[in-house]
Design a protein with these regions (language model features):
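An N-terminal assembly and electron-transfer interface module characteristic of large anaerobic redox
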Residues: 1-164
């Protein structure tokens, strides 16, 4: 029973993507990178002074606004992210990193850019292609994608050291 209070603390952290730990890290100078899919290697997002946050939209009610911009046939997760972004729920992000794995998520990330839902001057959205198979060719292509679309963008935009 003594551990229950600790579990409640961590459970409460999941209620908001911009939780206490993220706010503290950002106050300490960290660059907050949002991502939406497990295909993005977290280890690449947590380099130098960057931290990664998997985007969620807990406590989302109506999806009416995002449904206006996206079809109601697209997945609720993609529309919930757009809804939360339009509401200003992702203003804390410094960048959004995604993959071209599903068209609904591509569409939602496109709306982050088109609707300019983040007012930070250096905010950017970037996509990477996913490998179709695990072969040397695709591993090389995926490595290039991560370097060009994620690591190099972080270095160019924020001066992040990705030399390791």
């Amino acid at each position: 029973m003594k551990d229950l209070k600790h579990l409640i603390y961590f459970e409460n952290l999941l209620e908001d993507a911009n939780n206490e730990l993220v706010r503290q890290a950002q106050a300490d100078g960290s660059i907050v990178l949002g991502y939406t899919c497990y295909h993005i290697p977290e280890v690449l997002l947590n380099v130098d002074n960057c931290i990664s946050v998997r985007l969620r939209a807990p406590k989302t009610g109506s999806l009416d606004i995002s449904t206006y911009y996206m079809s109601n046939y697209t997945c609720d997760y993609a529309r919930a992210l757009v809804e939360r972004a339009i509401e200003g729920g992702y203003q804390f992000l410094d960048a959004l990193i995604g993959v071209d794995a599903c068209s609904a998520m591509n569409r939602s990330m496109e709306h982050f850019e088109v609707l300019k839902v983040n007012s930070k001057e250096k905010f950017f959205v970037t996509h990477t292609d996913m490998p179709l198979k695990v072969t040397d060719y695709y591993i090389d292509a995926y490595t290039t994608q991560m370097r060009e679309h994620v690591l190099n963008r972080l270095t160019e935009t924020f001066g992040v050291d990705t030399s390791d």
